[in-house]
Swiss-Prot record:
Binding partners and assembly: Homodimer.
HAMAP family noted in UniProt: TrmD
Compartment annotation: Cytoplasm
SUPFAM superfamilies tied to this protein: alpha/beta knot
Transmembrane residue ranges: none
Enzyme nomenclature, EC number: 2.1.1.228
Designated name of the protein: tRNA (guanine-N(1)-)-methyltransferase
Function of the protein: Specifically methylates guanosine-37 in various tRNAs.
A biological process term (GO) from this entry: tRNA N1-guanine methylation
PANTHER family reported in the protein's UniProt record: TRNA (GUANINE-N(1)-)-METHYLTRANSFERASE
One MF term in the entry's GO annotations: tRNA (guanine(37)-N1)-methyltransferase activity
Organism field: Coxiella burnetii (strain RSA 493 / Nine Mile phase I)
Gene: trmD
Highest classification ranks of the organism: Bacteria, Pseudomonadati, Pseudomonadota, Gammaproteobacteria, Legionellales
Length: 246
């Protein structure tokens, strides 16, 4: 499986940060292809203007239709005319791990990173297939959300992470938060590593990890527990967690 991503951005240099770590490894392995198109390169006036004042007044500037449309046209000429366009915006639906898993099978994709007060709505109506948000907060532009989505998709590609089970055991993969992790030394001040993790009993370790995952999810994200149908074993483990924590 190979992930092919195009990004429409006024700041393509920001994506140089992705050349490190897991994503950098995927790029070197040719598991990920990442290309950027700058709308400023498609502006037709001498000043290469990409924004203008909003109709109706108000603060800030709005990204213009034409430079964005031409940048998208160039991206689709390379990636394919039917390539889906995803606009990263706080007005979009909330991005979840389940959606990320879907998106890696929808490659190639074009990610549209807006700036300023937003994008001319007519561009969104004409060119955008989906709108996604990474959370209920505001950033200076869509570049960081685009990088979040690229990172989340890339780490699901087979062979990109160091261990084949790394992605499958992440938070949200099973609809639960991750369990606690420990490494050497065995004791720091008065905080030892839980003895079960030193036992070598893989069944007991798996049971402990699931119990901690269930308990941590209940403590921090009850919405995830409430939308999940717990098995008898999971409910028993959650009850044990409550007893041990009280």
């Amino acid at each position: 499986m190979k992930l092919i991503i195009g990004v429409i951005t006024l700041f393509p240099q920001m994506f140089d940060a992705l050349k490190s770590g897991v994503i950098g490894r995927a790029l070197k392995q040719d598991r990920l292809t990442l290309s950027c198109w700058n709308p400023r390169d498609y502006a037709t006036d001498p000043h290469r203007t990409v924004d203008d004042r909003p109709y109706g007044g108000g603060p800030g500037m709005v990204m213009k239709f034409e430079p964005l449309a031409l940048a998208l046209k160039a991206a689709k000429a390379q990636l394919g005319e039917n390539t889906k366009v995803i606009h990263l915006t706080p007005q979009g639906k909330l991005l979840t791990q389940a959606i990320v898993r879907e998106k890696i099978h929808a490659s190639p994709l074009i990610l549209l990173a807006g700036r300023y007060e937003g994008i001319d709505e007519r561009l969104i109506e004409a060119e955008v297939d989906e709108e996604w948000s990474i959370g209920d907060y505001i950033l200076s532009g869509g570049e960081l959300p685009a990088m979040v989505l690229i990172d989340a998709m890339t780490r699901l590609l087979p062979g990109v992470l160091g261990h084949k089970d790394s992605a499958s055991q992440d938070s949200f993969t099973a609809g639960l938060l991750d369990y606690p992790h420990y490494t050497r030394p065995e004791k720091i001040a008065d905080r030892p590593v839980p003895s079960v993790l030193l036992s070598g009993d893989h069944e007991a370790i798996s049971r402990w990890r699931l119990k901690q995952s269930l308990g941590r999810t209940w403590q921090r994200r009850q919405d995830l527990i409430k939308r999940r149908s717990l098995s008898e074993n999971e409910q028993r483990l959650l009850d044990e967690f409550f007893e041990e924590s009280s």
